[in-house]
Amino acid sequence: MWSYEKRLQFPVNIKEPNAKLAQVIISQYGGPDGEMGASMRYLSQRYSMPFKEVAGLLTDIGTEELGHLEMVATIVHQLTRDLSREEIEKSGFANYYVDHTIGVWPQAAGGVPFNACEFQVKGDIITDLHESMAAEQKARSTYDNILRLIKDPDVCEPIKFLRAREIVHYQRFGEALRIAQDHLNSRNFYAFNPGFDRCDSCET
């Protein structure tokens, strides 16, 4: 299905290690509003989406989120790859180091492991699209918080890129919601779920 290009969507070239920053940014790898959950959410939601154009959009964005996951992992890797033992101890990175050395492992900034309970697939068109729109806004807010903590332009620029893509995804999911509603009974979008109820004339 996929063709993998051996380059990032946006260049990441970090010169200075920073374990404290890595511990924050890793939340967008495996945290509650991170790229791992986003990719799994959209690539799972597409199967119960009966409208081809919307299912295609979920596939496109879910695929892009995998690229964003790779970017975040690269940022974390470059921030930690040249750490000295002293830097690990002083930065508070020791707890992570004990379990993972400097490997990239999915967790939130607070150390909570990635959990599939952080995202949902209800199999209901309206519910799932609202879930996706909310997810993009939460990710954007998280990137906003990260940007407030960054001084290194080598880190700031790729994070800005990722934040901008969350806004675009939010807008595209808004368009998808409109497309889905155009297919439904305009008098009551919640009368039935065409992803499950095979009766387009159902009304309440």
Predicted regions and their residues:
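Non-heme di-metal
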Residues: 1-204
